[in-house]
Amino acid sequence: MTEQAISFAKDFLAGGIAAAISKTAVAPIERVKLLLQVQHASKQIAADKQYKGIVDCIVRIPKEQGVLSFWRGNLANVIRYFPTQALNFAFKDKYKQIFLGGVDKRTQFWRYFAGNLASGGAAGATSLCFVYPLDFARTRLAADVGKSGSEREFRGLGDCLVKITKSDGIRGLYQGFNVSVQGIIIYRAAYFGIYDTAKGMLPDPKNTHIVVSWMIAQTVTAVAGVVSYPFDTVRRRMMMQSGRKGADIMYKGTVDCWRKILKDEGGKAFFKGAWSNVLRGMGGAFVLVLYDELKKVI
């Protein structure tokens, strides 16, 4: 293997391991966030049974669905997250070579910043093309609030993918893809761009204290998450439409979804579950720091 191939493999491994660990740890918060986002578009949750907020959701889930249901959809998320994050990190460095070749970060700060934004956004969009059906399945499984097998919409990851493909074709697994690409570019651009730029401006980036790295990563993750959150809400609402027919279809398309959420629920609805997203973001920040530490070891 060439040195470049070994470096790529190390990036893939370090990114994937870090992601799988952190995602499982924050899975309960992730499920709460998803339920708050999509409950308005769920056929299983009646208007009078909707969750009032994070605390109500955390209290009711174990009572109504069992404690283990907090991890519903987590397997799909870990499977999805391993290639997503690993590909993101690996491609990010390849895109950095394209966008940042020959750029001096000390004398060309804004050119350096723009290159980091572009490489982060391009890496996220590229990865999304490969793993979107897994992201779709994770959302639908997490939104499934049935207690037992007969009450549940899907029995698991495979059942979800098969049922939606039979009903809507492969296209059904890519519902909300366009708005996802828009959101992922905004999120990843901030996530990688600001993080790398901030680290690059430190006196000795390779030997930065882990606490400083974590603080930078935490801030970046929170800012990126809030900025791109409305796009995430719209894409997940669109995902909830797959498998529906006729009068059950709530939104004619992405633009109609934006318009109806704003008209029927108000601007605040775009940010439902956003606070739990910030809490979950601690796991995302941990991924960035853990990735850097793993690369030193591998």
Curated annotation (Swiss-Prot):
GO terms for cellular component: membrane; mitochondrial inner membrane. Its main location: mitochondrion. Residues 1-7, 100-109, 200-210, 292-298 are mitochondrial intermembrane. Residues 235-240 are annotated as: Important for transport activity. The modification N6-acetyllysine is found at residues 105, 268. It comes from the Eukaryota. Residues 38-74, 131-178, 232-273 are mitochondrial matrix. The modification N-acetylmethionine is found at residue 1. The chain crosses the membrane at residues 8-37, 75-99, 110-130, 179-199, 211-231, 274-291. A motif (Nucleotide carrier signature motif) lies at residues 235-240. This is ADP/ATP translocase 3. It comes from Bos taurus (Bovine). The lineage of its organism: Eukaryota, Metazoa, Chordata, Craniata, Vertebrata. The gene is SLC25A6.
